[in-house]
Amino acid sequence: INYIIRRWKILLLTLLIYLTSKTNTMRIQNALISVFHKDGLGPIVDALNAAGTNIYSTGGTQAFIEERGISVERVEDLTSYPSILGGRVKTLHPKVFGGILSRRENESDRAQMDEFDIPYFDLVIVDLYPFEATLASGA
C-alpha cells in the first residue's frame, strides 16, 4: 500500500504541474473524481477549478470538494441513479463509462455521446477503498 500511496502523490504532483503550466495545450474540460484517500487531493481540485474544469464526483469526495467552496456535478445527477450497495456501486453506468471510453475522433461515438447527452471525461482520478478492512468489518 505504501507503494500505491507514493505513486498517488507522484501522480498528483505531475498533474498539478501540468495544470499550472503555461504551455498546457490540452484543456481538461470534464474530470471524474471518486477517491477513498483524499490526502493530497485539495491542490488538484483547486487547480482544476481555477482552470475552469467541470468536476463530477460522488459521495464523500463530492463533500470534500464542496467544503473547499468548489462546485461539483453529482454523478447521481448525471446517471439519474443513486449510489447503491452501501456506496460500493456509484460509477458503474453507461453515462460514466461512455464518457471515459469514447473516442472523440470516431464519428459514431460522437453521435452516440450527443444522442445520450454523455460528457467526455478528459481526466479520471480514482483509487481503491481498503477492501480487506471493509471485508473484515462485514460491510
Annotate each language-model stretch with its function.
Residues 13, 28-30, 128:
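Short secondary-structure boundary segments
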Residues 14, 20-25:
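Ala/Thr-enriched low-complexity intrinsically disordered regions
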Residues 25-78:
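N-terminal glycine-/serine-/threonine-rich phosphate-binding loop
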Residues 60-136:
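Glycine-rich nucleotide/cofactor/substrate-binding loop typically near the N-terminus or early
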Residues 139:
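Short glycine-enriched, charge-decorated loop/helix-capping segments at active-site entrances
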